[in-house]
Amino acid sequence: LCEKEVMQPVCNIGTAGHVDHGKTTLIWALSNVWTTRHSEELARGMTIKLGYADTIFRKCPVCPPPQCYTINEVCSYCNTKTIILRKVSFVDSPGHEMLMATMLSGAALMDGAILVIDATRPCPQPQTVEHLIALQIIGVKKIVIAQTKIDVISREKIIENYNQIKLFVRNTIAENAPVIPIAPIHRVNVDALIEAIEKHIPTPDRDLSKPFRMYIARSFDVNKPGTKPKDLKGGVIGGTIIQGTLKIGDEIEIRPGLKSEKGKATEYEPIFTKVVGLKTGDIEIDKARPGGLIGVSTLLDPALTKADALVGNVAGDPGTLPPVLNEFSIEYVLFERMVGTKQQLKIENLRVNEPIMINSGTAVTLGTISSIHRGIATISLKRPICADFKSRVAISRRIDGGWRLIGYGIIVN
């Protein structure tokens, strides 16, 4: 493979784990990119929006494993030119529990995950439990565990923490996940982590003949203030392609779309537009397939896309998108105990008229339970979602001033 052939990532790998366990530092060690780009995030030292970082994994043809695995063009052991294996995209999801919703909307975009666990703290920490449950719900089964910060504790403590990790993941989807001790800030064992990712998070087989579909994870106006009308560029949407392919010149439909007031009723109308440009990272491409975050330049009025206005929408080939739902019924499963809180609070059943938060793809919306009957709840949404029947949604309840994940449901009608 040459550089040009690997312009677009082929696999999305999420990072999960408790706040301050080193997810963003780990991604930096694997890609040389800090995924905290927003000023508020840098000031508060936390990731609020999903961050994406692309990297090319390489292999030295001379050195033995794991030291042959690298992100460098030249092997640092023997100076041989390295061979390109593949380009992957890391999705950095927020760690704080108040932002669990964003984590869930990000997990919908992951082919595999690195569960980051801080070796200096007892395992599991509350959010580590919550994130593993979230990965389990969304069906991310290909997992590698990175045991971080091994440079600041003794060998005995690392082994003790390793045993805690193995106990924690027993009987979960991460039971057979490899545990790689790593010190990302010094790039110690990064080679072993790349080897584990290559073995345990393969590139998924994708059916590119399916109709194009993409979750919109961000949208913006690229025009500077004061741009002359004749120089204005159309709105840009960014997201991950779930299936199919997209090329310049394609017509796309976006649902639920645009809010329109009709008398007292609020309706949403689908938006139709044309693709005029495609980007992966900073590289312009003619055709895009699943993998990484894709920027799509359109002919939309930039006022429609500014400040993430279209986040939570779904884009696709016209006429192929799922229905827009204002109300739906779900078969729901609630966790036994509240995960992520210091006290393991018991979760009470859903109640009629209770306000809840629903995550579907990249959409986050509030809803009210209108009825419950034999494990099936009917939910009226404040803002509709575009979702297939049998698709999975996450359910959160307001507890102590924040939304906390309490379970999930499958849309049944």
How should these model regions be labeled?
Residues 20, 26, 45, 92, ...:
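Residue-level signature of catalytic and energy-coupling elements of molecular machines
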Residues 5, 167-310, 314-321, 326-336:
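Conserved catalytic-core segments of large NTP-driven translation/proteostasis enzymes
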Residues 118-120, 141-159, 179-190, 312, ...:
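G-domain G4 guanine-recognition motif of GTPases
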Residues 84-89, 93-100, 107-130, 136-160:
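Conserved Switch II/interswitch segment of TRAFAC-class P-loop GTPases
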Residues 1-93, 240:
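Conserved G1/Walker A P-loop phosphate-binding module
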Residues 12-15, 153-155, 167, 302-413:
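C-terminal effector modules of nucleic-acid-centric enzymes and ribosome-associated factors
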